[in-house]
Swiss-Prot record:
Gene: fbp
Keyword Magnesium: yes
Catalytic activity: beta-D-fructose 1,6-bisphosphate + H2O = beta-D-fructose 6-phosphate + phosphate
NCBIfam families per UniProt: PRK09293.2-3
Organism: Campylobacter jejuni subsp. jejuni serotype O:6 (strain 81116 / NCTC 11828)
Location within or outside the cell: Cytoplasm
Major site of localization recorded for this protein: cytoplasm
GO MF annotation terms: fructose 1,6-bisphosphate 1-phosphatase activity; magnesium ion binding
Protein name: Fructose-1,6-bisphosphatase class 1
Pathway, per record: Carbohydrate biosynthesis; gluconeogenesis
Any one annotated GO CC term: cytosol
Length: 280
């Protein structure tokens, strides 16, 4: 699996370099779920596909920007699912964005998830790699990823990152969010899931939520590319996840590779509070 991780690092570095002079315009294409693709979405996906295709340990890749699974080597063991550029719609305002990767063994399912990674393209290039414990790495002047620290969640945080159009929230979710603000939580929502999860991890706690809404009853975030890998990282850091019913997002099973789900990630206190509010 270390070989797979090393190729992901190469792809991340190439995307980071390309971001220095990006084309932020939209293409004429849409991805499987109907999102209009930025030209840089397509470029990033191409960089990752090209790089991972050189790794003999990868059986197949699944991209948010591809309709189907792409088989690379049927004799290999690992399947890599990825969002090539999470938060790409924020490129024109120069917000921090990132790439998300999940490494599955033999079959793409939460129970077969062996490692998860994400990169942050911000003021500096950082990479979080998680097998047993999330570890933060930072690119140095020699183009090497240097270990910075292990990432751990506190039992309770102060950050509230909540998505979904408010007018479409269910009443129970609106009440829950209000209760957090009543406790003094700070709103920290950028519109890039990877950036918001990264802030919660590095600050040690809080909650990220993207609930079921009237216009998206199954949520909008994709299980295999976004939800499972970030849930894996949060839980390995000592945090909790749920879809509002299950006690872990990693308990969920889906047949379709572009399946979506409501999702909540956070410290133990916030997730316990949410489950109580949702199931009263």
């Amino acid at each position: 699996m270390q070989e797979v991780i090393s190729y992901i690092q190469k792809a991340v570095l190439e995307i980071s370099n390309a971001l220095k002079f990006p084309d932020t315009s939209y293409s004429q294409n849409q991805n499987f779920t109907g999102d209009t693709q930025l030209k840089f979405d397509v470029l990033s996906d191409g960089i990752i596909t090209k790089t991972l295709s050189q790794c003999s340990s990868i059986k197949a890749i699944i991209s948010e920007e591809k309709d189907e699974i792409l088989t690379l080597n049927e004799r290999a063991n690992f399947i890599v699912a990825y969002d090539p550029l999470d938060g790409s719609s924020l490129m024109d305002v120069n917000f921090a964005i990132g790439s998300i990767f999940a490494i599955y063994e033999e079959k793409a399912s939460a129970k077969n998830l062996r490692a998860a990674l994400y990169s942050m393209y911000g003021a500096r290039l950082e990479l979080v790699i998680c097998k047993d414990q999330p570890k933060l790495y930072r690119l140095n002047a020699n183009n090497e990823f240097i270990f910075i620290k292990d990432l751990k969640m506190n039992e309770k945080g102060k950050i509230n990152a909540t998505g979904g159009t408010q007018k479409f929230w269910e009443e129970k979710h609106a009440k829950f969010i209000k209760s957090l603000f009543d406790e003094g939580y700070r709103l920290r929502y950028s519109g890039a899931m990877v950036s918001d999860i990264n802030q919660i991890l590095l600050k040690g706690g809080g909650i990220f939520s993207y609930p079921a809404t009237q216009d998206a009853p199954n949520g909008k975030l994709r299980a295999f590319f976004e939800v499972f890998p970030l849930a894996f990282i949060i839980e390995k850091a000592g945090g909790k996840t749920t879809n509002g019913k299950n006690h872990s997002l990693l308990e969920l099973e889906f047949d379709k590779i572009h399946a979506t789900t409501p999702c909540f990630f956070g410290s133990e206190y916030e997730i316990s509070k949410l489950l109580k509010a949702y199931n009263e």
